[in-house]
Amino acid sequence: MYGLDPVNTRISFNIRYFGTPWVSARFPDFGGQFVLDRHGAASRVDVSIQMASVDCHDSYWNDRLRSPDWLDVQRYPQMSFHSEHVEFQGSDRAVASGELNLHGITRQVELEISQLSCPAASAAGDTCSFVAHALVKRSDYGFAHGLWIGGNQVDIAISGVGVRRDASPRNAEAPPAQSTSATGNLTRLR
């Protein structure tokens, strides 16, 4: 089992604002795990994000994003992604097809995983690093407010490092994702 390193893992979203380059905000409160099986159907990806943790380094916009006009975190406190189908595309790329639940709406999306590196050992023990992106349309999830300001396309991005916790990942069953403030699990089958 691999636990996400809270120091080296970042979950964020990126969106265009009035035609500017991408503007981003991060979600420091998250949980999740991966089981990656190149030879069978045991692959699984689960990620959950606490929406109230959104942080764009501006208190005014943090409050606005949490409000009913935008993320409505009181009504929709969590965003989650679940996949049981991961298609590997070479040694360092994969696509996890699954369901993204956001703002009370669940839709099929693809989480594109790149720079996947799971060396057998490192100085700190076994690690696994990756970058992942999912492109979604805000309008698909009921976000009509401000489409003219910020555009419709949102890039949800994860840059992560997992640190091995379980000495026997082959036989480990992935538990459901649980949010634990910038911690999570990343499991890999060899």
Language-model features, listed with the residues they occupy:
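Low-complexity, acidic/polar, glycine-enriched regions of mature
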Residues: 1-190
